[in-house]
């Protein structure tokens, strides 16, 4: 799995003519991982392949709202085996994509030593709707 920094570097290497993404490192309470003047970006790295990938409703709502307020797009990137799967959430909302929102018991954090589970509202991003890099 790539680190968040490696995902950002890979994105920037692929999109040389665009403004580079910058990691949000100085704000531990940020709801997104990287940004540019065009994008708010949530990044996940996974070690298992899925046909649909989980997106948390809380992050969806707050980042989509922030994107609208600042005139940017909300991009969701999942890295799997060095491949980037990229969804433009604004575009999916514009075409009435069905996220299939529902509640599930999931780990409170991605810190695997913390086994505490909480109910989270989540939806799904189908791989077939992603751009692959």
Where are these regions (language model features)?
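Short glycine/proline-enriched coil/turn segments at helix->beta-strand junctions
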Residues: 17-18, 36-39, 70-72
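Conserved catalytic cores of phosphodiester-cleaving nucleases, focusing on short active-site segments
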Residues: 34-49
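Nucleic-acid nuclease catalytic cores
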Residues: 67-93
């Amino acid at each position: 799995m790539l680190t968040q920094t490696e995902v950002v570097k890979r994105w920037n290497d692929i999109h040389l003519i665009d403004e580079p993404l910058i990691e949000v490192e100085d704000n531990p309470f940020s709801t997104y991982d990287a940004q540019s003047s065009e994008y708010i970006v949530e990044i996940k790295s996974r070690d298992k392949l899925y046909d649909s990938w989980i997106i948390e409703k809380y992050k969806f709502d707050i980042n989509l709202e922030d994107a609208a307020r600042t005139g940017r797009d909300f991009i969701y990137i999942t890295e799997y085996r060095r491949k980037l799967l990229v969804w433009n959430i604004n575009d999916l909302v514009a075409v009435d994509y069905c996220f299939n929102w529902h509640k599930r018991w999931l780990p409170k954090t991605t810190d695997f030593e913390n086994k505490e589970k909480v109910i989270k509202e989540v939806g799904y991003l189908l791989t077939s709707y992603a751009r692959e890099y």
